[in-house]
Design a protein with these regions (language model features):
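Transmembrane alpha-helices
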Residues: 225-259, 289, 305
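Generic hydrophobic transmembrane alpha-helix motif, especially the helices
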Residues: 137, 147, 151-198, 205-206
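N-terminal signal-anchor/first transmembrane alpha helix
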Residues: 7-41
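Alpha-helical membrane-protein architecture signal
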Residues: 56, 100, 104, 108, ...
């Protein structure tokens, strides 16, 4: 009897693993079928709404455009090297100029730009939110004083922040040879302003929720302020902090696309806006490619943060959510 029960476990594991694979695949197929059927019924000023097949074709075209642009870049570099070599042959002391390639960014270049921008904005938000959240969590008076301000600023849209950020950056970030483009700085700061609140709030709540027994142990051991933070507060608050970080990263990615549309930072948001303004027959398909890419990258960012939470958090159950 026991041997029969034991023999069932491998079969049960196979069934469970099959469900993990098959159910998402079935859901994806249903989604594609519904998209295909619905797209044929929607007529726009640019034609029929693109379905999965047309969207994939536009993705293939974007891949081809990327490689064509890389070939142009390589040809430009080779011509420049030949020209400089010929110039140095005639005059070894001649000054040669190395000009960067200034071709248009491809779809994949814009993906990289968006990833760099959202990473910088998210890191800035994290650097501000976690220390401030710890301070507010440790001091109930400060938390009560600043909580109304936090609740006031938390729901402000990036479309409201961006004009203010743009004016401030234009007035303060003045340089003849800037290290970063103003559009990048505008997008970065807007992302940080909109995404820091979940991490700030969850960090403060996590700190205030530290077990009283652990706080008493810290007092008995006469730990210094920094030792108390490092050995008691942070380990206890880690699950809540990571919950805030996951929420902040999702908001950062969502906000970035809107910010790039207005700030004209050459990322995915600008790609969508340019295609919308272009209004060609291929524009709708390319916008659909961008929409799916934005969603897919957002999913990867969330899964990556979830995996990091599993590695660093002691609360494995919360890391599964």
């Amino acid at each position: 009897m026991s041997s029969n029960v034991i023999s069932l476990f491998p079969a049960k594991q196979v069934v469970n693993r099959s469900r993990l694979v098959l159910l998402p695949v079935i859901g994806l197929l249903i989604f594609l079928a519904m998209w295909h059927l619905a797209a044929r019924e929607v007529q726009t000023s640019l034609g029929t709404l693109p379905g999965p097949v047309q969207t994939f074709q536009q993705f293939s075209n974007l891949v081809d455009d990327h490689w064509q642009e890389r070939e142009k870049e390589q040809a430009f570099i080779e011509r420049q090297e030949k020209r400089n070599a010929a110039k140095l042959t005639k005059n070894p002391d001649a000054a040669v100029k190395i000009r960067p390639y200034t071709g248009k960014p491809t779809f994949f270049d814009q993906i990289i730009t968006s990833l760099v921008t959202v990473t910088a904005g998210f890191l800035l938000a994290t650097v501000i939110a976690i220390p401030l959240g710890i301070v507010l969590g440790l001091n109930q008076g400060l938390y009560q004083a600043f909580n109304p301000i936090i609740q006031l600023l938390k729901p402000v849209s990036p479309l409201a922040w961006l004009p203010i950020v743009t004016m401030v950056v234009s007035a303060t970030y003045v340089s003849d040879d800037p290290m970063f483009a103003k559009s990048f700085i505008n997008s970065l700061i807007t992302v940080a302003l909109c995404s820091l609140w979940p991490t700030l709030i969850n960090t403060a709540v996590g700190v205030t929720s530290v077990d009283k027994d652990l706080i008493n142990v810290s007092k008995v051991l006469q730990l210094s302020w920094w030792q108390h933070i490092r050995t008691i507060v942070l380990p206890s608050a880690i699950p809540m902090i990571f919950t805030g970080l996951r929420l902040s990263l999702g908001i950062a990615w969502m906000v970035l696309i809107a910010a790039e549309m207005l700030a004209q930072n050459p990322g995915l948001g600008k790609f969508v806006w340019d295609e919308f303004q272009n209004g060609s027959s291929a524009s709708l398909g390319r916008i659909m490619v961008a929409v799916i890419t934005i969603g897919f990258i957002g999913l990867l960012l969330d899964r990556g943060m979830l995996q990091l939470q599993k590695w660093l958090s002691w609360n494995k159950q919360q890391a599964l959510r």
